[in-house]
Amino acid sequence: MMTLQLSGYAPSRVDARRAAELRPLVEHFNIEYCAVLDSGHIEEWPRFFTEDCIYRITARENAELDMPVGLVYAEGRPMLHDRAVAISRTQMFAPRTMTHLLSAPRIVGEDGQEIWAQCNYVLFQTLVEGPTTLHLAGTYHDRFVRDGDELLLRERQVIHE
């Protein structure tokens, strides 16, 4: 099993033809994933993950120092569900909309069971009575598994600048 490389560059271990076959699957996944989040359907977010998933948001500086302490850490779909419910039902935040923009995914590895991919993202936030601002930017480092014809995230490491 390949581990996710969270900093620096490593060449893809997938040839161009195979990467071209896998890229549309990962793109479709990411488009649907962001559509759920951007539409405010936060409680549907955990369905994109396996039961034994890992989800973490970490600053690039921490990732480069191999100190994956981050803003968010969730292990398992139930933990993601708790987080999603807390976010969707809290009243402590001003009303806002979020908009994700993603690069094309880079397929970095595959072993028959998993697909490893990276994708740059920018997250914009618009408060009801304010301008749109850049909220976060960085890279998704993903481990996908197949669930029939669909993909699920076994691991998503969100490294932000």
Regions found by a protein language model. Give the residues of each.
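A solvent-exposed, acidic/Ser-Thr-rich amphipathic alpha-helical stretch
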Residues: 51-120
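Surface-exposed helix-capping loop/turn segments at secondary-structure junctions
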Residues: 36-44, 93-96, 149-150
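Short, low-complexity N-terminal intrinsically disordered segments enriched in polar/charged residues
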Residues: 2-39, 43, 47-51
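Hydrophobic pocket/interface hotspot
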Residues: 33, 45, 80, 117, ...
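A beta-strand edge to alpha-helix "cap/lid" segment located at domain peripheries
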Residues: 2-11, 98-101, 106-161
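Short helix-to-loop capping/linker segments positioned immediately adjacent to catalytic or ligand/cofactor-binding
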Residues: 33-35, 88-95, 128-131
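Short coil/turn segments at secondary-structure junctions
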Residues: 13-17, 64-67, 71, 128
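A generic "alpha-helical surface" signal
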Residues: 24-27, 71, 78, 135
